Amino acid sequence: MREGIFMSLEESEKRQEGYNKSLSSKIKKWINDSLTLGEMEARRLRHDPTELFTRAVQPVLWLLVFGETFTRIKAIPTGGVPYIAFMTPGILSQSVLFISIFYGLALIWDRDQGIIQKFLALPVPRSAFVVGRTMGAAVRGLSQTVIILLLALIIKVDIRWSIFSVLGTIFVVVLESAFFSCFSMILASLMRTRERFMGIGQVLTMPLFFASSAIYPISIMPKWLQVVAVINPLSYVVEILRSILITGVYENMLLHLGLLIVMILVAIIIATLLYPRLAS
């Protein structure tokens, strides 16, 4: 009887080992698939590097014109921080938002060219497609981050330069790119034409930007707009970046970071579920 029990235990252990190996191999395959797709997306940027500079024009104008002007006027309360320093994290977030939220346009283009259909025929998890796309968006977002921070250095914006601030900024920009590119993929899955997607994207970007703490504190907004700003993911991104780069006050940073990560996970799940609709 004992021998039978030992044999059952051994068989159970072998099955568990096989399951663990299978799970481990699946995870490794998923990571490799995601990285491969992310690399493919990054190559598109290498083939058209002028996109980096054309997209950098708007944030540069915001900092040089709007930022310098309102720093002199001193019309917006910033808690003793120079206005141009206050708005720099907001303009960085805006730039990443604008790049990421129109990322779904490339998906619609790929669908019209029949590329999405070919991808979906591959033995690759749908979530790997979504995560790979977010990696491509993150590369674009980080490239804009470099340009904006270099400009901030040139015009002598008072930024807290340190290893922590640089690594923290990279991490937050990747998170922002992930969320808004997933949001863009969700929109692309629901839109049938590029024109409709562009229209919806343009309608959403400006409210997301102005209904956040990017260029003014939430406290000076009307009450109804404060409610919108509190549930706006861009507000969390701006506040985290402002804590890291400008104020050094980390009181609510972990809360904002946690909420942002939860939003990203939900967005990835929804984008994964809707991704096959792109082929139809």
Q: Which residue ranges define each predicted feature?
A:
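Junction motif at the cytosolic side of a transmembrane helix
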Residues: 4-15, 19, 245-248, 257-280
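Membrane-interfacial helix-loop-helix junctions in multi-pass membrane proteins
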Residues: 44, 75-78, 160, 209-266, ...
